[in-house]
């Protein structure tokens, strides 16, 4: 295990100073992610944990810990309860829909956004009637992955358009009311 309490290991936010990660220089093992739900963080570094005693997530961020590999396994994706999948699918679909409002995207970003929306839209419409269909969950997971990749490649997160303020609000609501 790591030395320190979760509060000592999470990203620190000292007053009037920049945030820093106490774990940044620690040795790292390769990370292999096998997600249970579609989420746009599967290929990102770090993680966030909800703590009911705090008004924000406990963040554990380290840019050196981007996953080495991501595996989408049907059985693992089917292990999530319908309520959880419905929630994450709604988040993925809303994110892909809002990305279509962005303008002046480079062709690679636009292609990822369009493919992510196509996958999410087709799967989302059928999901609750075919809750045990692994192909729909894989499509939603791929949509989330493509959406995240597009945001990384575009170097902006909902920087403009009618949905530009929704991300922060929806994240706060999702953390507060899971």
Summary of predicted features, one role per range:
Residues 4-108:
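A glycine/threonine-rich phosphate-anchoring loop and its flanking beta-alpha core
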Residues 99-178:
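Active-site segments that bind and position negatively charged phosphate/pyrophosphate groups
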């Amino acid at each position: 295990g790591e030395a320190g309490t979760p509060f000592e290991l999470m990203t620190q936010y000292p007053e009037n100073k920049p945030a820093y990660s106490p774990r940044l220089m620690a040795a790292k093992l390769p990370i292999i992610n096998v997600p249970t739900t579609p989420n746009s963080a599967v290929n990102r570094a770090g993680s966030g944990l909800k703590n009911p005693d705090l008004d924000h997530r406990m963040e554990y961020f380290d840019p050196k810990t981007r996953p080495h590999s991501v595996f989408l396994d049907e059985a693992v994706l089917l292990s999530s309860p319908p309520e959880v999948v419905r929630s994450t699918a709604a988040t993925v679909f809303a994110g892909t829909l809002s990305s279509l409002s962005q303008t002046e995207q480079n062709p690679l970003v636009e292609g990822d956004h369009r493919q992510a929306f196509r996958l999410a839209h087709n799967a989302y419409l059928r999901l609750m009637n075919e809750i045990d269909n692994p192909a729909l969950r894989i499509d939603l997971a791929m949509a989330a992955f493509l959406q995240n990749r597009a945001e990384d490649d575009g170097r902006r997160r909902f920087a403009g358009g009618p949905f530009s303020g929704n991300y922060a609000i929806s994240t706060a609501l999702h953390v507060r009311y899971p």
